[in-house]
């Protein structure tokens, strides 16, 4: 795999026989792996722009919450945060990221908690019907 930015190798804080590999990368470069990992290029440029803004907002929100500070990083590379894998960068996603550079969804001066999902099997439900809604 090829990743942008710097790779940091640190001992695991929970298991002395393991290491932790952390990719230190600028947010716009981070999005170049997240957007194509979360949404196919075939969805079109406007959908990719919306995805870029949602993904940027999500990452910034997690960063500001220091959700993983004790672990030494800001976001995970799985669906627990956003999928950040070795998906091939593509021109459409990169253009969408560049066209929305720096744009974040805000409420009361703070980034919103921009949760989204990449797979719904064609069905969604209003949050008010979810058994764990507030």
Task: Please place each PLM-identified region on the residue numbering.
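Conserved, single-site charged/polar hotspot
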Residues: 1-134
């Amino acid at each position: 795999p090829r990743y942008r930015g710097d790779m940091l190798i640190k001992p695991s804080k929970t298991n002395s026989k393991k290491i932790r590999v952390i990719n230190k990368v600028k947010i716009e470069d981070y999005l170049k792996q997240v957007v194509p990992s979360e949404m196919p290029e075939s969805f079109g440029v406007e959908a990719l722009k919306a995805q870029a803004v949602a993904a940027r907002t999500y990452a910034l929100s997690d960063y500001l919450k220091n959700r993983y500070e004790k672990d030494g990083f800001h976001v995970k590379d799985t669906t627990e945060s956003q999928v950040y894998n070795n998906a091939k960068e593509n021109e459409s996603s990169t253009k969408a990221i560049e066209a929305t550079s720096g744009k974040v969804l805000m409420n009361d001066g703070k980034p919103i908690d921009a949760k989204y999902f990449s797979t719904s099997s064609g069905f969604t439900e209003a949050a008010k019907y979810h058994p764990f809604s507030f």
